[in-house]
């Protein structure tokens, strides 16, 4: 709900209180209750694709992986995703941006797998197919992850590079 996100952020920037949806990671969806947020001197927003900008159209021509090659050979899905990212532009306006950079796509996959295993364990669900499910899930976002890693790492005010154990390897300030 991009419009709602922008509304909440704008209210907080104007020093007004706002009601924001609550996201349940284990359910991968919002829950019915909302959270009351009071104005604060600093607003921190985070997310897997926070700060992303659309890729140039020319970059969308060739598939990024096997999933795109087999299921999006015409580029309809990747073009649609690119158009959706453009809708977030107003929400992503900030005074400072910090990019947490994973050491590799492989590390991101492993971290996501661990996160999903924890979520499944909380819900008492079977974890036997998690690796295959994660690989399939992440294939949908591989292009965007690679683009952000290339583009945002050069644009963020601060880049925090993590090692494979989630420790800070280095911090770069621009």
Where would I find each of the regions flagged by the language model?
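Conserved nucleotide-sensing/catalytic segment adjacent to the nucleotide-binding pocket
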Residues: 1-28, 42
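Glycine- and acidic-residue-rich phosphate-binding/metal-coordinating active-site segment common to enzymes
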Residues: 40-42, 64
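Alpha-helix C-terminal capping/helix-to-coil transition sites in glycosyltransferase folds
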Residues: 39-40, 93
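Glycine-rich phosphate/ribose-binding loops and adjacent secondary-structure elements
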Residues: 33-37
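Switch II (G3) loop of P-loop NTPases
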Residues: 43-49
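Conserved NTP phosphate-binding and transfer environment spanning the P-loop NTPase/kinase superfamily
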Residues: 49-174
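Short gly/ser/thr-rich secondary-structure transition/capping motifs
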Residues: 23-29, 78-83
């Amino acid at each position: 709900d991009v419009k709602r996100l922008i509304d909440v952020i704008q209210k907080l920037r104007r020093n007004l209180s706002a009601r924001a949806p609550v996201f349940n990671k284990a359910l991968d969806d919002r829950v019915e209750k909302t959270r009351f947020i009071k104005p604060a001197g600093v607003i921190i927003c985070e997310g897997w694709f926070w700060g992303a900008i659309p890729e140039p159209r020319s970059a969308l021509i060739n598939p990024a992986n096997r999933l795109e090659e087999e299921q999006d050979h015409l580029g309809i899905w990747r073009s649609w995703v690119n158009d959706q990212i453009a809708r977030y532009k107003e929400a992503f306006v900030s005074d400072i941006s910090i990019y947490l950079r994973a050491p590799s796509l492989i590390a991101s996959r492993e971290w996501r797998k661990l996160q999903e295993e924890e979520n499944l364990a909380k819900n008492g669900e079977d974890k036997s197919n998690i690796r295959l499910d994660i690989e399939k899930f992440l294939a949908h976002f591989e292009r965007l992850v690679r683009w952000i890693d290339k583009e945002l790492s050069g644009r963020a005010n601060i880049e925090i590079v993590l090692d494979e154990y989630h420790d800070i390897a280095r911090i770069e300030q621009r």
